[in-house]
């Protein structure tokens, strides 16, 4: 099974954790106004926090990673990472941090990391509101929880409504 097939299979799960900037689900009338305010004032900081979490996980665990498709017409430098199926988990940490900032700022493409000895946990950065951890064991969750708390973010379990 190639890396894209494994990622697709893991993404079919509806049991996962996600990283959020809010401690609880916000149902207030002004949520979208708050979200716009939060990211217009904190996007750089948020990108740095997510980068710190990912890079620390890559320091702890073996991993493989890929970028996903780019929109039609995108011709920037990062497109070759997808076109050539480059293992982004093996790039230097500064470059990985730049990629995370790119994905979270532009909100297109995504980064998918298979983490662990058997590469059975998926850390998926899809956009600002979709940073998911799928098929993580208790050891992974314990570490991720500590890293997320250290960065002032929240690890929440997805509950289907």
Which residue stretches match the model-derived regions?
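Structured alpha/beta or helical-core interaction and ligand-binding surfaces enriched in interleaved
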Residues: 1-130, 134-161
